[in-house]
Amino acid sequence: MHLRILIVICISVSSLTANDYFIRTWEKHHLNPHFWAEGGHAADFNRDGHGDVVVGPYWYAGPNFKKRHTLYSDKDTFEIKKAGKKEKLPGFPGELSRRNGYSNNFLTYTYDFNGDEWPDVLVFGWPGKNTTWYENPQNKPGLWPEHHIFQTSNGESPRPIDMNSDGKPELLLHSGGHLGYVQGDWNAPSKPWKFIRISAKGSWQRYTHGYGAGDVNGDGRVDILAKEGWWEQPAELDGKDWKHHPVQFSKGRGGAQMYAYDVDGDGDNDVITSLDGHGYGLVWFENLGKTESGSFNFKQHIIINREPSESPYGVKFTQIHAIDLVDINGDGLLDILTGKRFWAHGPGKDFEPSAPAVLYWFELTRTPKGVHYIPHLIDDNSGVGTQVAGVDINGDGHTDVVVGNKKGAFAFIQKAKKTTKAQWQLARPKRVKN
């Protein structure tokens, strides 16, 4: 197994209080150079007190991630020509093949599905195909038992989220041209889950971009977001379609995971999204309040876009195909974790496919002059897949990052070092325009 560890020299700086200043570096673990999945996650799978990382068919045992374990079949291979001879490589065509390919694992999450206190692994496979959870065998040898719970999970940004406030996750996805989510029977979580339709039939299909959820109108219920607007969850779930509030959250194909979050701290939730998962644009839509018709007005704010001049820090990159909303610096505000999906459609398609595969976190900052996001570069040779996960892998209280994509599998461990205000100011990202 190939494993590389290095300290990433990209520096993030943040202050938690007037007297606390931190410089943040990232310990980069290149767990595997082979392409197995477009996402990954973390949990303590062997319950030894150390967080582990899962990407594709493998989980890597913490704290050093050197020992690899297989949870489902890793027999997929492909051929390349090297020095005039054919060579067989594990996984799927990606960076090592110098040609494009796709995996059978689009997103990965962890959760204890059967309540035995051992974390299991949830895999959204190829869009439109099976969603499966793999049952942790409690340190017993062999592949993990698999449970296929839904056959046609459409969309490129599904994820688990508690839709009905019962403390357990539903699976946010769409199917058969309808928006909705999938609900399980927690007395029998390995049996097929049921799709809960919330919209009339539309043009949504397996490769639709941009999908999310959150409480948009502040009524305490989780609404559903798509690039065409948001669907209001009613007080009673009676099987009828949810009310659609049209908002153009993307003029193009749509982006990645979408979130409702109070960005500006004014008490109502705004919307965070990318504009095009294969193009440009990371934005937040300010919730301007309720209209006479009962809907809400939104104002778009650009974080980064097509031109460096559209960012106060001169940052731009393409293919924002994965977003996580997580508190990176421990200040209580949720930051944006994202980056460039490496070779979404290979080396010859999309915008700037061969530009550096960057991984960033955007620090949410509220000031008397308003809200802005400060970009902090984590790495410039990894990027994201269709998923990026911010999770405290090693339990030190700092958010770490897991990536799976066509460059392989990565874990980034955050290192926060207390410093002086002068050093903090010197290291802080500099604005190129006011």
Place the predicted regions along the sequence by residue.
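Beta-propeller-forming repeat regions
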Residues: 18-434
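Sec-dependent N-terminal signal peptides
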Residues: 3-14
